[in-house]
Swiss-Prot record:
It comes from Homo sapiens (Human). Residues 75-81 are annotated as: Complementarity-determining-2. This is Immunoglobulin kappa variable 2-30. It is found in: Secreted; Cell membrane. One of its GO terms (biological process) is immune response. Residues 60-74 are annotated as: Framework-2. Residues 21-120 form the Ig-like domain.
């Protein structure tokens, strides 16, 4: 009979909006681009993303139309295997940027920043 109460307690830990939540804000929300030209997206965190081990766990994901998201960049500036070098990540603390040096047609999609430093 204690199990439901325990489950409720666990679920309450994951309620968004509780104190300590990290808010990630991207801009711009929409970006018209020209093929062959550069593009950049900014991401700001409400708290520093520097973890106690000294690493900054900020990831960038790309979701092409009709596909699942794939990670492009991890720990701010490290490209995942197979990601073209026209993609680069930079930043520190609370402010981060994803840059595409020369936009290609296959780059159309939705881009997300995600932090992995603070968990509920």
């Amino acid at each position: 009979m204690r199990l439901p109460a325990q489950l409720l307690g666990l679920l309450m830990l994951w309620v968004p909006g509780s104190s300590g939540d990290v808010v990630m804000t991207q801009s711009p929300l929409s970006l018209p681009v020209t093929l062959g030209q550069p593009a950049s997206i900014s991401c700001r965190s409400s708290q520093s993303l520097v973890y106690s081990d000294g690493n900054t766990y900020l990831n960038w994901f790309q979701q092409r139309p009709g596909q699942s998201p794939r990670r492009l960049i991890y720990k701010v500036s490290n490209r995942d295997s197979g990601v073209p070098d026209r993609f680069s990540g930079s930043g520190s603390g609370t402010d981060f940027t994803l840059k595409i040096s020369r936009v290609e047609a296959e780059d159309v999609g939705v881009y997300y920043c995600m932090q992995g430093t603070h968990w509920p």
